Design a protein with these regions (language model features):
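Short, surface-exposed, charged/polar-biased interaction segments
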Residues: 1, 26, 47, 70-73, ...
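Anionic N-terminal interaction surfaces
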Residues: 1-24, 37-42, 78-80, 85-93
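Short, surface-exposed polybasic-and-hydrophobic patches located at secondary-structure transitions
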Residues: 3, 60-76
């Protein structure tokens, strides 16, 4: 199951890009050259996800992904409901 979601990473501003979901990883990608290489192609193994929470930033839908080793990443995701459904399927299959 490969899915693509339009998303922005909330890290030192709002960094537009996309989240790619496959059966093993969530990968956030942006083409902004002013962003650290770490965040231009941020790969998060699904097995390392501890928690996914949803919320809002102003009126935008957000998702916070908490990983092992105290890493947390907040994203604005425009199809949040579908993203959460996809993640629920992957994490519990």
């Amino acid at each position: 199951m490969d899915e693509i979601f339009i998303a922005s990473l909330c890290k030192n501003g709002i960094l537009g890009g996309a989240i790619y979901v496959d059966k093993n990883h969530i990968t956030y990608r942006t083409n902004k050259l002013t962003v650290s290489e770490k965040y231009r192609n941020l790969k998060m193994p699904i097995k390392d996800i501890i928690e996914i929470t949803s919320g809002r930033m102003l009126f935008f839908p957000t998702v916070t992904i908490s990983l092992k080793h105290d890493y947390k990443y907040k994203f604005i995701i425009f199809n949040k409901k579908k993203f959460l459904s996809t993640m629920n399927e992957l994490r519990h299959s």
